[in-house]
């Protein structure tokens, strides 16, 4: 692998385990410490500093990119990010139930290309998949809203965010559903 040679990586198994663990948690924030513990729990000992190096290598080679939590303090912005794969084909190699993860990853890649470093996720008592401060836009991703519990969770997250942050554009991206959800004074595009 070019990555191994380029950065003289000696612990290639730890890197492979890290990539697998990132794929398995593609929709969740991951701290450096959590990732180091996950990799170490497989018997591949690794330090937090090495995890940081490997993550930087993965981003420098455009295998992955990260998003910061808009709502967190500076230290947490740096150490607790969401990681996405630049190529859904690579991500799909690691997933058992890929639909929602692949859809969210595809949306992340598309938004990252369009908005660059202005793209965040939002997590403070509410979890919203994507947040754009400049456009006051919040986006949730769900494979489908046909399940009433899923629909309620996704809609409520956006409405709660709109109560706490200036958001003009609320959107839920699904695989193939389209509608307008009106809740009070807020409209959510699906």
What residue spans do the PLM features occupy?
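Accessory nucleic acid-recognition modules appended to NTPase machines
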Residues: 1-138
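Domain-level recognition of nuclease-like catalytic cores that cleave nucleotide substrates
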Residues: 176-190
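Short, hydrophobic beta-strand segments that form beta-sheet elements in well-ordered domains
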Residues: 121-122, 168-174
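Short, charged, amphipathic alpha-helix that recurs within catalytic cores of restriction-modification
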Residues: 151-164
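Short beta-strand-loop-alpha-helix junction that forms the active-site gateway
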Residues: 135, 141-150
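Short active-site-adjacent structural elements
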Residues: 128, 147-150, 179-183
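Hydrophobic/aromatic beta-strand patches that form the interior of the parallel beta-sheet core
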Residues: 84, 139, 171-173, 189
